[in-house]
From Swiss-Prot:
Family matches, as SMART domains: P4Hc
Pfam family, one: 2OG-FeII_Oxy_3
Membrane topology field: Single-pass type II membrane protein
UniProt gene name: ogfod3
Keyword Disulfide bond: no
Designated name of the protein: 2-oxoglutarate and iron-dependent oxygenase domain-containing protein 3
Gene3D superfamilies: q2cbj1_9rhob like domain
Domain of life: Eukaryota
Cytoplasmic topological segments: 1-39
Amino acid sequence: MATRHRRRGGSAPSWAKPGKPGERPGGPKKSRGRTSWKSLLIWGVFGVTLGLMAGYYLWGELITDDSVTEVLAAQRDAVAQRFFHVPCSQDYESLKQFEACTPRKCGRAVTDSVITLQEAEKMRRLAEAGLSLGGSDGGASILDLHSGALSMGKKFVNMYRFFGDKLKDVMSDEDFNLYREVRLKIQHEIARTFNISVSSLHLTKPTFFSRMNSSEAKTAHDEYWHPHIDKVTYGSFDYTSLLYLSDYSQDFGGGRFVFIDEGANRTVEPRTGRLSFFTSGSENLHRVEKVSWGTRYAITISFTCNPEHAIGDPTWT
């Protein structure tokens, strides 16, 4: 159900009143009447035009500022599966050579029935353990088990090089096996939903855990709230998935995922074990709200149709 909020007010523009028209020397009185009628008509058309322009501007402001919001999946709801179709953009023209993987339809999906609560809780513990070794000075920290990238202060380190064998005190082969099993489940669900070949879909980079809180941003990497298109920001993405590892309104405030559509913003409220996935093109412009309190955990798992952009599952070697 759409929730509509009051528009931000603003004083109407103040217009100067026209002065009293002067009389033309020797002109007949009816001429002055015709001039007055035309003047009123011109000012009327001008006023209507300005009104339409102002209305258009205010409507644009309304949408941009999240004033019209539809909740696609609330945290309190257990969602078996919901799919929301959106027209495909032109961003997939280069994928025609990968026919078995090219989107036959575009959209976004939400499900709470693919990843179990137990699996999600184990994934969160893995994220917490890895991020406990570092963490950003700002509000957003990442942990990439594939490349080893770990936020530390205002920079990133390669945790495999930085910590070496000490990492095995924090992570295990069992953790990596769980990671692979979760990834496979998500890959199969994306393929089933979009009616594409699961074998034509490849894990790609970056794929990473994220931890967000209300700390002030210290670098551009901490500014996670800007609207973006995944296929533009990360060129290899064709399908994006997010697995949420904490609960909106219980573990944190703010931090909802927002699809920015013409006419409304549509949100997904994170819930532990909730899987949200979508085609990565410009039909799915989106952003994440700033976290206002608490800590938000999630993992982004991305897929490509191009085998040249594929990466393997994380391993110790």
